[in-house]
């Protein structure tokens, strides 16, 4: 029986997704199996073991979500680049917030 090339690519895509997801889940489990994830401090702040740079980068990159990658481009194309003024200035306050979270401020 001949398999349609579209079906073959879909099967390859699904299998690749399942393999990569399984590997990421297993490695994540190995790295966090001894961590305190039951308390809010352990879960949200990684037991206060992260630096301000890591927390700040995480907060900035979280704000650059799909909305930023798709929505801002569409609005900029339709109008102008003023919509980017919402994200760019937030980098500095987010860095200060990260320092406050870890207790340096």
Swiss-Prot record:
Subcellular location: Cell membrane
Key words, A-Z: Cell membrane, Membrane, Transmembrane, Transmembrane helix
Gene Ontology MF terms in the entry: transmembrane transporter activity
Transmembrane segments: 10-30, 44-64, 83-103
A Gene Ontology term for the protein's cellular component: plasma membrane
Family: Belongs to the sodium:solute symporter (SSF) (TC 2.A.21) family.
Protein name: Putative uncharacterized symporter HI_1315
Organism of this sequence: Haemophilus influenzae (strain ATCC 51907 / DSM 11121 / KW20 / Rd)
Species classification: Bacteria, Pseudomonadati, Pseudomonadota, Gammaproteobacteria, Pasteurellales
